[in-house]
UniProtKB/Swiss-Prot annotation:
Region forming the signal peptide: 1-23
Name of the protein in its database record: Protein FAM180B
Source species of the chain: Homo sapiens (Human)
One GO CC term on file: extracellular region
Lineage summary: Eukaryota, Metazoa, Chordata, Craniata, Vertebrata
Pfam family, one: FAM180
Length: 183
């Protein structure tokens, strides 16, 4: 399970780096934009900064909140920004995550996600990985794994907009076995 968690975290971090090379712009009607994020969050962090913060590791506390493990990094402006995003904009339960996923699926035929929404999507996926790892019951692990797989598919959909033939992203295919909580 630890190797799977490490692989999934590395996958999300790699996708975070990919988000830095996308050229998506905010669009009206998106689930979140820079005006709804709050005063100190005017634009997403550079991918290398986000990579450093995530590489330091996160921990899930007893209240279900994710925190940066490295206190020094957590005290920096980017660290405080990430903490704010994780606490106030990334769903902390299955129902909230499923609602966010439904909003993304409703937007699938539209333009690429804004930079804010793409970052939100990636952080929600990362949150799923930690919650999957912390889940104690098989049924809950299965639901978190399913939601993570769907978020990964939405990430591929968004990255593929305008590039993939017939607007169809590559399938998760063999990745599904990695995400299976019942090996």
């Amino acid at each position: 399970m630890a190797a799977t968690l490490q692989f999934l975290v590395c996958l999300v971090v790699a996708i975070c780096l990919l988000s830095g090379v996308t050229t998506t712009q905010p669009h009206a009607g998106q689930p979140m934009d820079s005006t709804s994020v709050g005063g100190g969050l005017q634009e997403p962090e550079a991918p290398e900064v986000m990579f450093e913060l995530l590489w330091a590791g996160l921990e899930l506390d007893v209240m279900g909140q994710l925190h940066i493990q490295d206190e020094e990094l957590a005290s920096t402006h980017p660290g405080r920004r990430l903490r704010l995003l994780l606490q106030h904009h990334v769903p902390s339960d299955l129902e909230g995550t499923e609602q966010w996923l439904q909003q993304l699926q409703d937007l699938r035929k539209g333009p690429p996600l804004s930079t804010w929404d793409f970052e939100h999507l990636l952080l929600t996926g990362l949150s799923c990985v930690y919650r999957l790892h912390a889940a104690s019951e098989a049924e809950e692990r299965g639901r978190w794994a399913q939601v993570f797989a769907l978020l990964a598919q939405e990430t591929l959909w968004d990255l593929c907009k305008g590039f993939c033939p017939q607007d169809r992203p590559p399938s998760l295919g063999s990745w599904a076995s990695i995400l299976d909580p019942f090996p």
